[in-house]
Amino acid sequence: ETGITYTQVAQYCVLIFAYLVPAIFVSILMTSNPNPALGFGDTLTDSSVYLLDKLDQISIDLGFGAYTEFKKSTIDIFCITAALMVGTAGLPHVIVRFFTVPSIKDARKSAGYALLFITILYLTAPAVAAFARVNLVESIQDKSYETTPAWFKNWEEIGLIAWQDKNGDNKITYASGDAFVPAKPVFDNSSDGHPRHITNKPHKLTDNEVYIDRDIVVLASPEIANLPGWVIALVAAGVLAAALSK
């Protein structure tokens, strides 16, 4: 039991560092605030504009609506919060704490620590998403394929990003709505330095030309922010630790 506990502690240490270190890096770069949860509501380093205000403007320009706009009813918020609380309490990482410690007191303490560190992850998640959205749009919007960052082509090569020039202007347009029909792209060749050919039909009712798999937001965030290679490697190690902890 002690061995299992220390193994889980080691896995979580790798996971939390892999998640927080890139978030702290990006928060410092964008807001000069080392705390991602606080940097989320701080001003940008290159201007006096608040990050949330910029995110609102970007979201509106792309057709998504203001990021901070309150759209849900009170009952919706209550149900979402209740689901999050019950789901967190039922996480295997929390429940297992009651079977790997010798006493009830230790079980309560262990579960308390588990919930504390899970809370840190939850508080950081919105900041990671906000940072990634801003950096993503600024790095690809209205850019030609040839001038897109290396990360765009790397993720395209494995099929998690796709682009199709709908309007023939040779520039990337990222907007709301699906880019293709069906939404998930199907490729028929490798990129070879050019956009991979997509067999899907373009979605005629939207201006969006880009497909980005939502599962890569956390993974690609360090690359999008142009962080050092060791940070990207740390994220990969964290993903492996998360997979092994299930």
Regions found by a protein language model. Name each.
Residues 13-233:
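Loop-to-helix junctions at membrane interfaces in multi-pass transport proteins
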Residues 88, 130, 239-242, 246:
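Gly/Ser/Thr-rich helix-start
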Residues 234-238:
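Non-catalytic terminal/interface segments that mediate subunit docking, oligomerization
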